[in-house]
Amino acid sequence: MESFRQIKNNNVDLISNNDPLDKNRLLIEDLWESVLREECPDDQAERLIQLKELSYSKQMNGDSSKTFKNEIVDIVNSMDLAESIAAARAFSLYFQLVNILEQRVEEDRYIQSFTNKDVQKSHDNLDPFAPALARQNAPVTFRELFYRLRKLNVPPGKLEELLQEMDIRLVFTAHPTEIVRHTIRHKQTRVANLLKKIQIEQFLTKEEKNSLKNQLKEEVRLWWRTDELHQFKPSVLDEVDYALHYFQQVLFNAMPQLRGRIAEALTENYPDVQLPSQSFCNFGSWVGSDRDGNPSVTPEITWRTACYQRQLMLERYIIATSNLRDQLSVSMQWSQVSSSLLESLETDRVKFPEIYEARATRYRSEPYRLKLSYILEKLRLTQERNNLLSDNGWKFDLEGEIDNKNLDKVENLYYKSVNEFTYDLELIKNSLISTGLTCESVNTLLTQVHIFGFSLASLDIRQESTRHSDAIQELTNYLDLTMKYDQMSEEEKIKWLIDELNTKRPLIPSDVNWTKTTEETFSVFKMVKRLQQEFGSRICHSYVISMSHSASDLLEVLLLAKEMGLLDQNSQKSKLLVVPLFETVEDLKRAPEVMERLFKLDFYRSLLPKVGESFKPLQELMLGYSDSNKDSGFVSSNWEIHRAQIALQNLSSRNNILLRLFHGRGGSVGRGGGPAYQAILAQPSGTLKGRIKITEQGEVLASKYSLPELALYNLETVTTAVIQNSLVNNRLDATPEWNQLMSRLAETSRSHYRKLVHENPDLLNFFQEVTPIEEISKLQISSRPARRKKGAKDLSSLRAIPWVFGWTQSRFLLPSWFGVGTALSSELNSDPRQIELLRVLHQRWPFFRMLISKVEMTLSKVDLEVARYYVDTLGSRENKDSFDDIFEVISKEYNLTKSLILEITGKNKLLESDRDLKLSVSLRNKTIIPLGFLQVSLLRRLRDQTRQPPISEFIIDKDESRRAYSRSELLRGALLTINGIAAGMRNTG
């Protein structure tokens, strides 16, 4: 094997013999080659290894890229289908092994940073203000952050005030659903655990290390023989199960440690500052409740999702309570017990005589064990009731569809709310404390209960705005209003909606057969009311309106909520927090105007929930990164979101309203993704104030939450960034000259982007032909359609996720950078001296630095020679000239952008200041080349199948008897390459 070792020999400065990442890459490559040699025929294994080595060695030896890539193309095109599938699987396996390794090393580095008590001293000489903090690419730990804040003379009272108000919400989503199967994820976890054991080699004997390596090989060989592709399109409940896996396996046990680490860091630096609330960091979910464009998410599905979440929590609490019962063997012969606990035991004895008879003799002198036996019974009865509710659906009590005897038998015995469970645990805790004892396990369980409750995560409802206006249109047509609703102006709509909101009579007749769509819209609100009755308001409180354009969009939802009993007119309280989602650039620009109209409405203001010690009204507002980027490009999207935040915060402050911004960030840069720490630091000064809500996309869950320390690292990163942004204000956002410059860059970039993407009539054909977009839509990875409207083929109907996915697979990555070079060039052409200002912005302004950093990282992954091959091979003959023109525009913009990014950053090469990232991207770029050519080969064969006669000259199979491969077999091969490239690029859409 020469690949990684060759790079080691040729890049002494880049590779370290002592670095665990470098060291274990050799282990991974040896493992990969060993598995191939045992699982594939000899000639096939050697050919696959040769193919990977060719990518490394030819570039390392200085061969021209065109020459060695032609060699790869020749090898790929000579493969039959069986060999092609083996190659796709092999490269996919390789990249997934590398991903696991990098996650493991990242986890170890976090552990090291947490346990190294001297780490903060390296930052003593940092300029503590924004410029220096902006230069820190690496996230800081709580210990480092509090040490810095102390050096900055941040008053303890100011820090404590922020911590008490801190509210961090991470919302798991299912779009895109992670492309890797759940079964494969389990195998990856086992591989990660074995790697972890191997990495402590200094404590292992030679025999133990060899045994672990053999186990590792066995696991990977089993993985090789497991199907990577979903055999069926996952249902919404499958996606729910996938997302909740991370709560079950990692987050349930990890979350209590997060607050513990804050406590330790405060003790060292701010010993008198109180800890934040136990639930300062909590979770939400869209999985099973986001119905925007997904007809599979019905009211019944959302109900079953809530029941499933409660089932998982009850299972965890039963296990934890059972463990507590084993642990708390305190005897009354040797310890006092509080009178409150003894009184509760007497009450429980009356309610649960069977438990008393079964346990009293065994635990007659062990009150804690007896109390925990009663708690276990209550949890089991709660679980039994939950199963009945899940099985019979959300309508049962409304329509009397089932016999309630089974529910009656547990009435008054189960936990009606999580508060009752908490009360029982507090009794135990306080009794222990009163007698001089403590039990960390009780404290841990209480923290888990405070964070997760019985609900696990709150479910945000999301629906597109026109669904509500269409329902009201149908309603008003039935009521035969003088003026049709869709003919009203915005002012007339607002007046009519407010009048109806203030009217106590019902508006919606109960005996009308509405259209299916309208009936389902109404049913969602009915289901939410039932959810809140059963689970409490915590389970489902936010209603997100996608594609919000106007004030009436929010008032329509409030009117429907009122009609379904979710709005109390007497107390003027709403049980729903209505959250507008502004997605396009034009809507982002209009957002302050829309919200100002609403804030001026006394009725609307009165419905906002009052929070915190100040009891101020709270408005949650969501900003969409994906569609604004697809609409106007990377720079324009980010700048308009930045500006909107400042304007909305100023508006909220003037109206004495608290603002919680909900960032709809995707996994990829083209959808707002990237390092969370940098992104949060780059938020405008004064917009966070300890409150933030962020989506965690399905595709990145594994990279953030698959391992306990990795999850803690991500959570600590987000939390420290929120604290840092909130306390160390960067007032550079208010610099007029900088804002004017950014506005010009955004406008020029947007114009150039839209000229290609929206105004060039050939771009859509280009995208459909030279990327695997149509094949991506056939991947069984999500319950959600790739397009908003069934059968539509226009760009506007295509979702942002497959839009970014297609460009990523073909190595263009266009949404993440196109237009940047032209914008920068335009600025410099007007005044070459502006280069100095751009460099200052990069050094001192976190927002601009984040922008440039993301573009730089994305450019490093672009490979225009591979992209050119997609165009030449997959583009139709009749479109050759127009496609060549489009490629030339893209190529010119790439080269311009790259040169100017290097000029601004002062670098000679992309990523040269980030050694680990540069090495990771470099290795992936070299290894992924054959997979791209293989994908093109299979896509060409697949698409030729639809032509009569087929025109491809590629070999389908060397065996004459097996040449007639079906379209499904070719599709399978193509989909495997999509899997592999997604793993190699480390994201999908």
From Swiss-Prot:
Cellular component GO terms, alphabetically?
cytosol
GO annotation terms (biological process): carbon fixation; oxaloacetate metabolic process; tricarboxylic acid cycle
Q: Which UniProt keywords apply?
A: Carbon dioxide fixation, Lyase, Magnesium
| InterPro entries named in the record | PEP_COase, PEP_COase_bac/pln-type, PEP_COase_Lys_AS, PEPCASE_His_AS, Pyrv/PenolPyrv_kinase-like_dom
Q: Which reaction does it catalyse?
A: oxaloacetate + phosphate = phosphoenolpyruvate + hydrogencarbonate
Query: What HAMAP family does the record tag this protein with?
Result: PEPcase_type1 (MF_00595)
Can you say what this protein is called?
A: Phosphoenolpyruvate carboxylase
Organism ancestry:
Bacteria, Bacillati, Cyanobacteriota, Cyanophyceae, Synechococcales
